């Protein structure tokens, strides 16, 4: 073989060895996928580097994600950024507009959300809630005087109403006894009174007559009812009774007048008057559109700020509880090596080819140097 042939042969051999070596090294990153054994001993370099170090790689990737990529500070910064807020507000605005155009009733909307029998549940909740609150208030104030827990302003207004109540009672009484019904009632009362007196009553009836006595009593009765002293007397009596009532505890009031039963009876009447059915039959769009401006302009931004602030405040604790490093490790462990190889090669295919060609180039240069030494020496 001539000098040129030797020179060319060694360059080709060196280039082939360099290219094959680099290509083999790239393949050995992933392959073989499992270890091979010969005569009971594991063949060296099996499995490939990545399959062999898979557990360590998964652990390190988990730590890298939690310590350097998905850090609490980075997520907080993203959450509180104007971009996220604007996107969230845009979504809220679009959702509100969609709901404002909805033809569904409130009942249908709740049913679509999986909430069945909302009216019955609401009525039951209101009844239960008011019972609990009334019982709680009764236990809290049952041994305290009424005047101690009534607001001062309310007490002052009630105190001012006592004389007016006296005037109202006397006026209504006067109007009643001036009416035909009142006159008849007064006559019957006088008749019953005289009958209860036996012979004396019979004698009075015989001499005066029932109608004559009623006609004589009525003007005096009306005169008494219109008298200022009567009004003052009644106002004083009502004030005294009101003062006594204010000094009662709820327990004492309950003992005397069944105040607790009266309270719960009033509650039942109030709830019976509270009709929830019309609300659930309303069109959802009518309710939303009525407050659309306030929802998108006021409530949504405030709720968003509060929600993002709360999430940011508890984010570090949430991430610790999630243990993202374990999640990443589990996902990497479950990820097929074949798919990982395909993904890496598809991304770096050109670079790996260049590495192979570089190996061939370096091998060819080394072969040329070796040929030069062989020829010269």
From Swiss-Prot:
It is a multi-pass membrane protein. The keyword Transmembrane applies. Signal peptide: none annotated. Keywords: Cell membrane, Membrane, Transmembrane, Transmembrane helix. It comes from the Bacteria. Pfam families: DUF445. InterPro entries: DUF445, UCP032178. Belongs to the UPF0754 family. This is UPF0754 membrane protein RBAM_010020.
């Amino acid at each position: 073989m001539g000098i040129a042939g030797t020179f060319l042969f060694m360059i080709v051999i060196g280039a082939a060895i360099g290219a094959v070596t680099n290509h083999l090294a790239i393949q050995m990153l992933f392959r073989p996928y499992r270890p091979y054994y010969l005569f009971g001993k594991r063949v060296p370099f099996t499995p490939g580097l990545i399959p062999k170090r898979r557990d360590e790689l998964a652990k390190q990737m988990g730590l890298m994600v939690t310590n350097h990529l998905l850090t609490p500070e980075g997520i907080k910064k993203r959450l509180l950024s104007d971009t996220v807020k604007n996107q969230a507000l845009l979504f809220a605005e679009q959702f509100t507009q969609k709901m404002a155009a909805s033809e569904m009733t409130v009942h249908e909307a709740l049913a679509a959300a999986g909430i069945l029998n909302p009216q019955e549940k609401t009525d039951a909740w209101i009844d239960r809630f008011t019972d609990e609150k009334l019982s709680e208030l009764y236990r809290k104030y049952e041994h305290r005087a009424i005047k101690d827990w009534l607001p001062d302003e309310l007490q002052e207004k009630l105190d001012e109403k006592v004389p007016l109540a006296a005037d109202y009672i006397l006026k209504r009484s006067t109007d009643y006894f001036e009416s035909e019904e009142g006159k008849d009632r007064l006559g019957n009362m006088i008749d019953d009174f005289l009958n209860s007196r036996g012979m004396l009553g019979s004698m009075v009836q015989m001499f005066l007559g029932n109608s004559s006595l009623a006609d004589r009593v009525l003007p005096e009765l009306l005169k008494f009812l219109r008298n200022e002293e009567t009004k003052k007397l009644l106002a004083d009596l009502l004030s005294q009774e009101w003062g006594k009532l204010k000094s009662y505890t709820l327990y004492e009031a309950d003992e005397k007048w069944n105040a607790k039963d009266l309270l719960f009876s009033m509650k039942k009447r109030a709830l019976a008057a509270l009709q929830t059915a019309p609300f659930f039959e309303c069109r959802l769009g009518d309710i939303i559109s009525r407050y659309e401006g306030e929802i998108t302009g006021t409530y949504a931004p405030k709720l968003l700020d509060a929600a993002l602030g709360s999430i940011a405040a508890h984010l570090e604790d949430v991430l610790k509880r999630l243990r993202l490093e374990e999640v990443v490790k589990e996902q990497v462990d479950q990820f097929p090596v074949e798919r990982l190889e395909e993904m890496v090669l598809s991304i770096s295919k050109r670079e790996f080819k260049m590495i192979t060609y570089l190996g061939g180039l370096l091998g060819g240069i080394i072969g040329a140097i070796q040929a030069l030494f062989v020829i010269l020496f």
